[in-house]
Curated annotation (Swiss-Prot):
Lineage: Bacteria, Pseudomonadati, Pseudomonadota, Gammaproteobacteria, Enterobacterales
The protein's enzyme class: transferase
Residues the entry annotates as binding 5-phospho-alpha-D-ribose 1-diphosphate: R78, R103, D130, P131, M132, L133, A134, T135, G136, G137, S138, D199
GO BP terms, alphabetized: UMP salvage; uracil salvage
Keywords in alphabetical order: Allosteric enzyme, Glycosyltransferase, GTP-binding, Magnesium, Nucleotide-binding, Transferase
Regulation: Allosterically activated by GTP.
Protein name stated in the entry: Uracil phosphoribosyltransferase
Reported cofactor(s): Mg(2+)
Length: 208
């Protein structure tokens, strides 16, 4: 499995700000979107381009444009919505597919409760967005849904990832790609990432 830890100084700086315990909801939400945008930049670096002739200010000019690769952004509800706008800044024409998952706090297993995928998802590259890759359960279950619907080109974008979640994802879906702003220390006894970000969903939606 391709694993990319994005170590750009801007990513490191913004993620560091997000780790502050008393960060405001507004600021956390802004930073989640900004880091999501930077991760998208990395995740789409291999998109093919083609030469197209357009009408410029001084006549015809040859430019590069993305070659036919359609994209769907797949936020995992609810926290994934906090990264979605940043992703769309880079790929504004992407379609949105939504998957609802929550984690059973006793078993730590994902529980699906909603899904609405674009009709031609089998023709698109899916960018799954979720702030945290902890045990990996929610992301793995989401990939299961996408593959069942015919999607074969899948990339996962997360703010922070635990080694345990990475290992589980690689075992279940070695053909996907993972892009993260940080590979953190690991999980505590409650299944939360250390040092992590706390509850990203609560911080994004102001329910902490």
């Amino acid at each position: 499995m391709k694993i990319v830890e994005v170590k750009h100084p801007l990513v490191k700086h913004k993620l560091g700000l997000m780790r502050e315990t008393d960060i405001s909801t507004k600021r956390f939400r802004e930073l989640a979107s900004e880091v999501g945008s930077l991760l998208t930049y990395e995740a789409t670096a291999d998109l093919e381009t083609e030469k197209v002739t357009i009408e410029g200010w001084n006549g015809p000019v040859e430019v590069d444009q993305i070659k036919g690769k359609k994209i769907t952004v797949v936020p995992i509800l609810r926290a994934g919505l906090g990264m979605m706008e940043g992703v769309l800044e880079n790929v504004p024409s992407a379609r949105i597919s939504v998957v609802g998952m929550y984690r059973n706090e006793e078993t730590l297993e994902p529980v699906p409760y909603f899904q609405k995928l674009v009709s031609n998802i089998d023709e698109r590259m899916a960018l799954i967005v979720d702030p945290m890759l902890a045990t990996g359960g929610s992301v793995i279950a989401t990939i299961d849904l996408l593959k069942k619907a015919g999607c074969s080109s899948i990339k996962v974008l997360v703010l922070v990832a635990a080694p345990e979640g990475i290992a589980a994802l690689e075992k279940a879906h070695p053909d996907v790609e993972l892009y993260t702003a940080s590979i953190d220390q690991g999980l505590n006894e409650h299944g939360y990432i250390i040092p992590g970000l706390g509850d990203a969903g609560d911080k994004i939606f102001g329910t902490k």
